[in-house]
Amino acid sequence: MRYHNITRDDMLNGDGLRVVLWVAGCSHCCKECQNPITWDPAGGLLFDDAAKQEIFEQLDKPYISGITFSGGDPLHAANRLDVRNLMAEIKEKYPDKTIWLYTGDSWENILHYAIMQYVDVLVDGEFQVDKKDVKLLWKGSSNQRVIDVQKSLRQTDPMVPVLHCGDYA
């Protein structure tokens, strides 16, 4: 896996103060994407032990709510296995921290992925410039959804996602 940045004390990409891992690799290539530099899966830096240690040092802080995986797309084929393994390690080491995941994929297409067992909140859907709204919380366009993954998976019909913010659209 490759990455472009690790952001500390982030308040824009999930609940509370978070650490954000911006991975390299995205096949969605959304028009007016905020991070087109992250599209190339060969771009950025190799995610090594030093990068993992930096994330763990942030997660050790009691005021950090959790980690957000963004990019790029953490579910890009070049990232999925490494992201899943890192999430599993984080859940084991930091069970009270939340994991957020941003992807251009839709919930309906990915809800059966093994990685979902580690995700608390998913922001799904491609950014659509014609639906851009800067007033939206945690997402860039109104087609995207902020989904409570674990509640959704426990439902009788997980295809209908439970939104993290209730009626918030």
Region roles according to the model:
Residues 93, 114-117, 140:
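Short, conserved loop/helix-junction motifs that constitute active-site signature segments
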